[in-house]
Swiss-Prot record:
Family indicated by similarity: Belongs to the Maf family.
Single GO MF annotation: nucleoside triphosphate diphosphatase activity
One GO biological process term: nucleotide metabolic process
Annotated catalysed reactions: a ribonucleoside 5'-triphosphate + H2O = a ribonucleoside 5'-phosphate + diphosphate + H(+); a 2'-deoxyribonucleoside 5'-triphosphate + H2O = a 2'-deoxyribonucleoside 5'-phosphate + diphosphate + H(+)
Enzyme class: hydrolase
Pfam families: Maf
Enzyme Commission code: 3.6.1.9
Stored PANTHER family: BIFUNCTIONAL DTTP/UTP PYROPHOSPHATASE/METHYLTRANSFERASE PROTEIN-RELATED, BIFUNCTIONAL DTTP_UTP PYROPHOSPHATASE_METHYLTRANSFERASE PROTEIN-RELATED
Any Gene Ontology CC annotation: cytoplasm
The species this protein was found in: Synechococcus elongatus (strain ATCC 33912 / PCC 7942 / FACHB-805) (Anacystis nidulans R2)
Protein name listed in UniProt: Nucleoside triphosphate pyrophosphatase
Length: 199
């Protein structure tokens, strides 16, 4: 059995690194789906729909069979969705509000077989407690630019990891891709995971 092509419908370097870490070779084909077309207030439903739309947009463009993986993440604090900050000032204000607080990082996962259009969906939720960081730390962190590119204004795998006091649940979900959930999706799709390690 040949190993099917696995396509990551995301430009996220963190997701690509996670996949490489577990020995999965992927083609990167970022989705250009307009996320503003999806307006949902429920965080898990939002990320699940966005992950599906991203994967579907890339799956439709395939001329050869492939499994397409789409993901989307969002942070919610007290049920309020916190996306990527639009400016440094917004990132600073966000951090001043969330320091010392618990948040929930939701990541939607969608795997689509481009040939059969079969789909497998999952959403992972991880609780994160932010440290009691000082204003000077917040401003220095925002000045690095890292928070401006991340859901929730932090990157666990980057400098932002210094400001995470506690994690309850899957830590790779916080980075943008739950490896345990990915395994479940690949198994459901009959992807030969162990064989992929041998190629």
């Amino acid at each position: 059995m040949t190993t099917p092509r696995l396509i990551l419908a995301s430009a996220s370097p963190a997701r690509r690194r996670l996949l490489a870490t577990v020995g999965l070779t992927v083609e990167v084909q970022p989705s250009h789906f307009d996320e503003s077309l999806v307006q949902l207030n429920d965080p898990p439903a939002l990320v699940q729909e966005l992950a599906f739309r991203k994967a579907a947009s890339v799956a439709r463009s395939q001329t050869e069979p492939a499994l397409v993986l789409g993901c989307d993440s969002v942070l919610a604090i007290n049920g309020e969705i916190c996306g990527k900050p639009a400016s440094p000032a917004e990132a600073i204000a966000r951090w001043q509000q969330m320091r010392g607080q618990w948040g929930e990082l939701h990541t939607g996962h969608a795997l689509i077989d481009s040939a059969s259009q079969r789909r497998w969906l999952a959403c992972g939720t991880t609780r994160v407690r932010f440290a009691e960081v000082e204003d000077a730390e917040i401003k220095a962190y925002v000045a690095t630019g890292e928070p401006l590119a991340c859901a929730g204004a932090f990157a666990l795998e980057g400098k932002g990891g210094l400001f995470i006091a506690e994690i309850q649940g899957c830590h790779t979900n916080v980075i943008g891709l739950s490896l345990p959930l990915l395994r479940e999706l690949l198994l459901a799709a009959d992807y030969p995971l162990l064989q992929a390690w041998q190629t």
